[in-house]
Amino acid sequence: AGSRGIANVNVITRAIVDYVKEKGAYPFIVPAMGSHGGAKAESQKELLAGYGITEEAMGCPIRSSMETVLLGYSEYGKPVYQDKNAHEADGIIVSCRIKPHNAFRGPYESGVCKMMVVGLGKQKGAESVHSDGLGNMARNLPANAKVVVENSNILFAIPCVENAYDETALIEAIPTEKIF
């Protein structure tokens, strides 16, 4: 779960949790927000609570930590990280919003790739992908995301798209092999 004001994020997140439970699994939520909340685990959990995402409301644990695992290096030599709790899970479902980025343009801006690289990469992931400046984000973001897909258990992504009124307009699951 991320830190940006996504419409209905608590309803969407709870629906994903319920779906996973219906399949017989034991879900947990990981704050996927890079360095937001001052890059502090408890502050990230508090940000989620502000969106109505609490353990009580979601019916599952929230495992908040800034600890990461190094997954490998991109083709451009960038280290790629992943939240340790997410990495140790049997599978990861990436929930996010797809929208244009406000500071760069490219084939992948704000969405699944950014959530995998920056959100689940925590502060280290954010620093790595931003280290060459915004001018190289359109190159680094998908390159780092490919390392995530190749070296972790991303089951699928379930992004939403909002309309011009910031209302949920579309939610569609994307199989991992169709992220790129």
Question: How does the language model describe each region?
Answer:
Residues V11-V20, S43-T54, Y108-V118:
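A glycine- and small-aliphatic-rich helix-loop capping segment at beta-alpha/alpha-beta transitions
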Residues S43-P107:
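An acidic, phosphate/nucleotide-engaging active-site surface
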Residues I6-N8, H36-G38, L70-L71, H101-N102, ...:
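Flexible loop/turn segments at secondary-structure boundaries
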Residues R4-A7, V80, G135:
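Alpha-helix capping and helix-loop boundary segments enriched in small/acidic/polar residues
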Residues F28-H36, M58-T68, A157-N163:
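Core alpha/beta catalytic barrel or barrel-like domain that forms the active/cofactor pocket
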Residues Q82-F180:
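Conserved, well-structured core segments that form the ligand-binding/active-site neighborhood
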Residues A1-K45:
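N-terminal active-site beta-alpha-beta segment that forms phosphate/nucleotide-binding
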